[in-house]
Amino acid sequence: MNQLVECVPNFSEGRDKGKIKQITDSIEKVSGIQLLDIDTGSDTNRTVVTFVGSPKEVEEAAFQAVMKASEIIDMRKHEGAHPRMGATDVCPFVPVSDISMEECVGIANNVGKRIGKELDIPVYLYENAATTEGRKNLATVRTGEYEGLKEKLEDPDWKPDYGRTKFNVRSGATAVGAREFLIAYNINLNTTDRTYANEIAYEIRERGRWKRSGNTNPFYYKGDVVHFEEERYPDGNSNFIGSSFDELFEHYKKTTGKDLRERYLSLGLDPE
């Protein structure tokens, strides 16, 4: 079986179809690459692209996409509901077949090094590629977002893994990582009051409440709340990394007594 790697870069552009096409064209120009999915969001002003190929093909396609994004996206003008810190916000590599997580970590390092050296964009390695335990969680790495990046880069504790500590005002910074498949579980609430969504998120999100009185064994998921102006509802979202859909369905069944298969809309790609 041939080695197959998936890359799921997130770009800080979800409204200009011309710019999005320039990025996806740069990916498809790399021989052997299969572009599988393009998911754009106007409120988030963000596009998630999924493509697969051999390790070398994916390495090159990922770098070309980051380079194109750095040319056409100006973070000084970016506005959107989703947390972000760079033109290419995140660029994870996922082992699909006949390749190990360690090899994907190597790919993340190769791409991260090129981004830092050739594009002068600060790079932070996260998840399985993280160089310290404190950088494994993407939410932690992205704390402060683009607006707080200049100050963050001045902190010795946040020296980039690749690239200079100089603030790239146009492109921001990029998080490059290696991880298992991720299931993003989003819940739309039947209310325009964000308070309810915040309360739910505080209880289940990984960073959670500042203080959990009497709760010595809380459960955590990576989560946040995003308010979509177009649809006029708050959206609670949780990320399950390395999980299967069966585990997610079972969790929903236990907590609600209902079958999630009858109540959800699937977007993107099924890891199977």
Where are these regions (language model features)?
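Long, contiguous binding/interaction regions
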Residues: M1-E272
